[in-house]
């Protein structure tokens, strides 16, 4: 079953803009200054936030429809903005070239060291000249809407005028255009600089993914000036962007709605430093992007609640991407350090075996699942992280530390929420807004524990589908995994009880000794069920790829 086709909002914006251009020219009916009235200001020389003068957007409608562009920009400067962006698109964002002129003049008078970016859907060199005349110090060039040759020629024009360039990318093809542009204009840049902006928002659908910017980290030159664009509304999300190592953060709605409160966002971004949590998310983002390029759609598979070393070996052999171990005294699947030492020995053996056969060994990610951060079991899991026996922690149904918290700098982590009602949906959405790039959702069970085999209400799932990349747990089995994949396209699926052994029925004549023999070890997996699970997953992925 194919997912509904999303509207291509970008195409609509470009069509409307072209119609206005055809009617009024690239001045869009505004008076353009005959000459530039100020020198070009260097764009974002240090790590900082770019705050945006923004009245509306296609996704949110009116944001601050009555804002005064010049006054808002001056407030941004007082709040610590490293640069100021001015949206000049008229139909959907309700900006104008008059805003650009007014902001440039006002900010230069009060804060001459702050550069102004013209943000629009520029398509011709003439628009670069107009931007320069109106006082812009930098221009946005969106690789997605420009052919490579046009991108390069517009970049040359900008640099010839001393303007810096914010080249925005999001798709694989965009990255190639960016690299070609950089090679083409390498000589003669002068003081102007090229920045790489990566948008969390897909301009075609306006859906957000906060990990997309980080997914390109390993494919750009070291030292590239990278800007995290869109989607940040809270100080926690600002900290996440700073934590991930970006040079700049472009913020629109959050700043425009409360210009006088923007300093908290700016400070959080600037103060956040990379840590082990950021390294984990960057690695995951890059791996996920590489996986999509190579395989197309292929969800990550996590097998959770393992207690038997043979099951761990089966997971490795079948290709599980993640293996989960429970560190909660309330769980029958709780494990401790000695078992993780066995796992370490097994992984070393498997790596040696693969090397002897000249095969590639892909090590699964080892996750510790905790339900109470203050419990002895959780403290044991944190120690195992520091000792290299676990890779990350799943905070299951308990508060997860926000990004860039110094106390948690050495603990890679993600949140898992129990979903059973509207309040749980709001909790999930709140975590996303507060800088958690992925949140696992599990069914809320009557026992309060995970791994019960209960399913999430599909009404609730439908409410969050499309809000983020889904990480799903709760009642997933070989019998239903194909339907789940075809309906929801999860990025990760988490299976526990769905592949566990079940005790056979006892005959009436069974005595106590026989009863003992038929007891099943807590968390013990059924190899045949796991084999069937992976086969069903592959079948579903094949169907998704055919639909694509």
For the regions a language model picked out, list residue spans one by one.
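An N-cap/entry alpha-helix motif that binds or orients negatively charged groups
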Residues: 2-64
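Structural preference for beta-strand elements that scaffold enzyme active sites
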Residues: 48-52, 83-85, 113-117, 137-140, ...
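Active-site mouth loops of central-metabolism enzymes
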Residues: 50-70, 114-123, 143, 226-233, ...
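N-terminal active-site wall of soluble small-molecule enzyme domains
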Residues: 60-159, 163-166, 172-177, 213-217, ...
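Glycine-rich phosphate-binding active-site loops on the catalytic face of alpha/beta enzymes
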Residues: 82, 86, 130-150, 189-205, ...
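Catalytic cores of alpha/beta
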Residues: 123-135, 172-185, 222-223, 228-251, ...
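Active-site/ligand-binding-proximal alpha/beta "capping" segment
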Residues: 183-271, 438-447, 453-472, 476-479, ...
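C-terminal helical cap(s) of enzyme catalytic domains, especially alpha/beta-barrels
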Residues: 210, 215, 219, 242, ...
């Amino acid at each position: 079953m194919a997912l509904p086709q999303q509207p291509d909002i970008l195409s609509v914006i470009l069509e409307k803009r072209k119609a206005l251009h055809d009617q009024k020219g690239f001045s869009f009916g505004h008076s353009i200054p005959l000459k530039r009235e100020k020198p070009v200001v260097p764009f974002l020389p240090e790590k900082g936030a770019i705050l945006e003068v923004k009245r509306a957007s296609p996704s949110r409608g009116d944001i601050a429809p009555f804002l005064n562009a010049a006054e808002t920009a001056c407030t941004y400067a007082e709040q610590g903005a490293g640069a100021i962006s001015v949206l000049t698109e008229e139909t959907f964002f309700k900006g104008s070239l008059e805003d650009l002129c007014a902001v440039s003049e006002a900010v230069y008078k009060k804060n001459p060291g702050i550069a102004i970016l013209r943000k629009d859907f520029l398509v011709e060199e003439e628009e670069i000249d107009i931007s320069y005349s109106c006082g812009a110090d930098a221009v946005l060039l969106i690789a997605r809407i420009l052919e490579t040759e046009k991108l390069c020629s517009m970049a040359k024009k900008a640099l010839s005028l001393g303007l810096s360039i914010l080249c925005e990318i999001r798709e694989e093809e965009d990255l190639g255009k960016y690299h070609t542009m950089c090679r083409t204009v390498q000589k003669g840049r002068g003081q102007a600089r090229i920045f790489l902006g990566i948008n969390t928002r897909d301009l075609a659908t306006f859906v957000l993914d906060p990990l997309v910017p980080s997914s390109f980290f390993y494919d750009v030159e070291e030292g590239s000036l990278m800007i995290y664009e869109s989607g940040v509304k809270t100080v926690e999300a600002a900290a996440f962007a700073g934590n991930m190592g970006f040079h700049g953060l472009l913020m629109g709605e959050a700043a425009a709605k409360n210009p006088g409160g923007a300093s908290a966002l700016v400070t959080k971004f600037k103060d956040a430093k990379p840590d082990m949590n950021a390294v984990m998310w960057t690695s995951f983002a890059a791996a996920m992007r590489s996986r999509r390029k190579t395989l197309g759609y292929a969800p990550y598979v996590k097998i959770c609640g393992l207690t038997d070393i043979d099951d761990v070996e089966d997971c490795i052999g079948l290709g599980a991407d993640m293996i989960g171990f429970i560190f909660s005294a309330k769980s029958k699947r709780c494990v401790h350090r000695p078992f993780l030492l066995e796992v370490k020995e097994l992984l070393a053996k498997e790596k040696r075996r693969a090397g002897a056969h000249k095969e590639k060994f892909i090590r699964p990610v080892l996750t510790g699942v905790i339900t109470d951060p203050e419990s002895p079991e959780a403290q044991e899991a944190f120690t195992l992280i520091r000792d290299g026996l676990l890779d990350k922690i799943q905070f299951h149904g308990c508060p997860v530390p926000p990004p860039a918290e110094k106390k948690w700098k050495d603990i890679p982590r993600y949140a898992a929420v129990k979903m059973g009602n509207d309040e749980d949906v709001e909790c999930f959405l709140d975590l996303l807004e507060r800088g958690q790039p992925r949140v696992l959702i599990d069914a809320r069970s009557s026992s309060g524990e995970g791994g019960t085999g209960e399913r999430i209400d599909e009404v609730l799932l439908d409410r969050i589908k499309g809000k983020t990349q889904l990480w799903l747990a709760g009642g997933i089995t070989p019998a239903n995994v194909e339907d789940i994949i075809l309906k929801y396209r999860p990025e990760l699926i988490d299976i526990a009880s769905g592949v566990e052994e079940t005790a056979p029925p006892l005959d009436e004549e069974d005595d106590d000794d026989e009863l003992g023999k038929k007891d099943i070890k807590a968390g013990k997996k059924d190899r045949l069920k796991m084999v069937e699970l992976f086969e069903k997953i592959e079948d579903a992925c094949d169907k998704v790829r055919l639909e694509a």
